[in-house]
């Protein structure tokens, strides 16, 4: 299992997993960090505490993991993206290994989880062309924009239930990764000088996440759980580097200028609150709200002469998720009655500004299933399948429509059970 975790982790690290021009700003497109069980509910989960699923978005949930078992969860996805700007359309495809996580019960009322998740993605390649002089139309220019890589986090977390109904937890993560972004300006006339700028950053820092869950029984068949999360603001200690290369069209000589900004990136305060209503262990309905306070942070920007940290490049990011799951009976003898049916919807505001205006807003809907995997001795493992549609758009800019298929495998193994010889 350890070897499998390592090989899958390397695959996760190798992914950028994105085709979107909007990933060229900030730290890229922030990941939803959904797992197999909540992808079908569009990421809702701050109030969920499942005994047979790994819910890393609120570490307090680890205290609910079954004793005597080891949970291993890995997810893959494939997506088709459609881009539309001024009637010009283009499609792109991606397939990725998204996450690898595990959890187990360490002591009474204490669970442990660890794994690797995406934090953000950078991936785009497009060009813009036009006439240098609209009147003469003799020469035209081409600006080419390219970017790749992304950021990931490897975490370990604890969840503990000190008193009945109340759980607390924490994740500590190593956050690492890099981005490379290039802008190249070239001309059809070989006598005009060309210009290219390369922007890069490499991060290796930490991230802390804290969580609380409180469950209250409100009737004979109904429970309500309140979930809260908090991640503190801190500087990632990483520099932002940029170099500019001017190519002389006459003799081919290069003029290179380099810039570097120390401690250029920060993570903001992040808070979340969620409610989950559980009716008779059949219906589970959740509502989450998260806020990421990016607005007061600065971003590295080239102003034409210098590479500097600038205010006004970020906005606070708000996200609302609503999701539900229905299962007639987890231990029913009928297979279809053990299947978990899920659906969800979410709305997200941008954390970046583009040319002084808000970046892309996101609206997403999803639906999916949790299918029990039946083997010779148990049916506690699950195959989680979901489909998601995402609309991403900003005023007067490109519109993106994304259809994504998520597949997660949750293996529930009896690692700690003592077997008796008959």
Map each language-model feature to its residues:
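Peripheral, non-catalytic segments of secretory and membrane proteins
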Residues: 3, 75, 103, 129, ...
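N-terminal, post-signal peptide beta-strand-biased segments of exported outer-membrane/organellar beta-barrel
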Residues: 12-118
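Bacterial N-terminal signal peptides
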Residues: 1-9
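Outer-membrane beta-barrel porins/channels
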Residues: 15-39, 109-422
């Amino acid at each position: 299992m350890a070897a499998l975790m390592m090989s899958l982790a390397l695959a996760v690290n190798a992914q950028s997993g994105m085709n979107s021009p909007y990933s060229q700003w900030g730290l890229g497109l922030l990941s939803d960090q959904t797992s197999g069980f909540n992808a079908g509910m569009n990421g809702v989960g701050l109030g969920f505490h499942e005994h047979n699923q790994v819910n890393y978005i609120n570490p307090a949930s680890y205290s609910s993991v079954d004793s005597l078992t080891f949970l291993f969860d890995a997810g893959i996805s494939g997506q088709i993206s459609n881009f539309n700007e001024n009637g010009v359309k283009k499609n792109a495809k991606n397939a990725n290994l998204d996450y690898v996580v595990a959890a187990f019960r360490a002591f009474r009322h204490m669970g442990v989880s660890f794994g690797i998740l995406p934090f953000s993605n950078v991936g785009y390649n497009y060009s813009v062309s036009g006439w240098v002089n609209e009147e003469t139309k003799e020469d035209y220019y081409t600006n080419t924009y390219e970017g790749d890589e992304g950021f990931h986090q490897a975490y370990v977390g604890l969840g503990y239930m000190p008193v009945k109904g109340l759980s607390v937890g924490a994740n500590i993560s190593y956050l690492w990764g890099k981005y490379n972004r290039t802008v190249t300006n070239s001309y059809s006339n070989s006598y005009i000088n060309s210009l290219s700028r390369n922007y890069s950053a490499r991060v290796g820092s930490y991230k802390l996440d804290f969580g609380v869950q409180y469950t209250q029984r409100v009737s004979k068949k109904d429970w309500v759980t309140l979930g809260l999360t908090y991640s503190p603001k801190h500087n990632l200690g990483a520099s932002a580097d940029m170099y500019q290369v001017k190519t002389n069209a006459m003799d081919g000589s290069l003029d290179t200028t380099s810039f570097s900004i120390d401690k250029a990136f920060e993570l903001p305060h992040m808070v979340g609150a969620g409610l989950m209503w559980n009716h008779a262990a059949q219906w589970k309905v959740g509502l989450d709200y998260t806020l990421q306070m990016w607005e007061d942070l600065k971003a590295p920007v080239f102003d034409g002469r210098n590479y500097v940290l600038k205010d006004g490049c970020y906005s606070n990011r708000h996200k609302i998720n609503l999701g539900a799951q229905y299962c007639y009976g987890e231990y029913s003898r009928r297979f279809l009655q053990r299947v978990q049916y899920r659906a969800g919807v979410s709305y997200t505001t941008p954390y970046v500004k583009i040319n002084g205006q808000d970046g892309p807003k996101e609206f997403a809907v999803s639906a999916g299933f949790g299918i029990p995997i039946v083997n010779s001795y148990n049916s506690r493992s699950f195959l989680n399948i979901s489909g998601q549609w995402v609309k991403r758009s900003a005023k007067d800019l490109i519109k993106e429509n994304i259809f994504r298929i998520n597949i997660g495998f949750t293996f529930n193994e009896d690692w700690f059970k003592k077997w008796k010889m008959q």
